Amino acid sequence: MRPASAEITITRMTEHDLLEVVEIEEESGLSRWGWAAYYAEMQGTNRDLMLIARVAKAPIIEHQRLAGYIVARESAGELHINNVAVRDQFRRRGIGIALLGSIIETAKRLKVQVAFLEVRRGNNAAQELYKKVGFKPIARRADYYSDPREDAVVMSLTLGEQ
């Protein structure tokens, strides 16, 4: 993968990244996948759609080397973005956009026509991030999330004609 900017590097996630990925997942309050689910996903055909971001010149705090990650699946010409997360101290530095841009580039190489994701209805910051990349809200899923219970906004992005 190419660097997204001079200081952000996006690469494929490896097994060695999983403990930190789970840590970022917990910090971000995402629905819990856990180590085993990420590992199982990595063994399948979608491993090229599991990316991590590192920031050059970032202070390494204990074992923290990753700034964020994204996990998606491709099926029947569609991309489903499952998780996007960036550590608090790296937010608003373009990492989310870099991760989304890299996954979209990969999806286009795979001849994916459309990308979908769900986001918590109350997560306005994430919705704005997705809109910056071109996603549009298309539907709502009632009570999609638990702990706490919340509706999801379904967003899509057409890739095939871009």
Predicted regions and their residues:
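Conserved glycine-rich acetyl-CoA-binding loop
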Residues: R87-G101, K108-L110, V114, R120-E128, ...
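Conserved catalytic-core motifs of GNAT/GCN5-like acyltransferases
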Residues: E118, K131, K136-V153
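Accessory recognition modules or surfaces
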Residues: I97, E150-T158
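Short aromatic/hydrophobic contact patches that present stacked aromatics
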Residues: N83-A85, F116-E118, V154-S156
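Non-catalytic, surface-exposed connector residues within folded enzymatic/regulatory domains
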Residues: R32, R93-G94, R149
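Positions that flank functional sites
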Residues: A40, G122, Y145
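Acetyl-CoA-dependent GNAT
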Residues: R2-P3, T9-Q89, L100-T106, L110, ...
